[in-house]
């Protein structure tokens, strides 16, 4: 068992961690993975069945580079492994849900004609917001679903990877 002590790169953990241990933490630094970069890039390359439809969608934008905008609200009915109900709408200061003006301010830095693809775990909420109504916005609604009815993430991830900018 080895625990990452903080959220940035820990050289001591990287250099001295024994093989065969269970790692715990977020490991958000690229420095943990630079020695296996090629293998990771290969493993995380979308196969043609996923990438081709996404590329076709991008071609419909007539060469305009889209902005990826992700709205994270969380499912108000989520239950963690301990049985506690939670969602980002209930997390307050730790994981605040961004108000619409956050997205307005972020988008003001871009050309108003640049298309925006909106991704969300709360698609119905996004559709209800007047802010996302103009033609500039396309709301991603993956067709593939898991048995429980939740959307599969791979098409959204592929589309996000093809966007030129990201607002999260």
Where does each model-flagged region fall?
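Secretory-pathway luminal glycosyltransferase catalytic domains
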Residues: 1-112
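Donor-binding and catalytic core of enzymes assembling or modifying cell-surface/extracellular glycoconjugates
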Residues: 110-168
């Amino acid at each position: 068992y080895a625990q990452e002590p903080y959220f940035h790169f820990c050289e001591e953990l990287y250099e001295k961690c024994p093989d065969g241990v269970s790692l715990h933490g977020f490991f958000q630094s690229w420095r943990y993975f630079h020695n296996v970069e090629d293998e990771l890039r290969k493993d995380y390359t979308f196969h043609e069945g996923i990438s081709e439809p996404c590329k076709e969608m991008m071609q419909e934008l007539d060469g305009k580079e889209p902005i990826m905008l992700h709205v994270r609200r969380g499912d108000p009915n989520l239950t963690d492994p301990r049985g506690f109900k939670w969602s980002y709408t209930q997390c307050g200061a730790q994981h605040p849900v961004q108000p619409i003006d956050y997205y307005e301010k972020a988008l003001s830095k871009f050309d108003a004609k640049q298309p925006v693809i909106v991704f969300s775990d709360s698609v119905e909420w996004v559709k209800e917001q007047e802010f996302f109504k103009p033609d500039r916005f396309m709301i991603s609604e993956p067709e593939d679903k898991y048995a429980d009815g939740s959307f599969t993430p791979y098409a959204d991830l592929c589309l996000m990877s093809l966007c030129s900018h990201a607002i999260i």
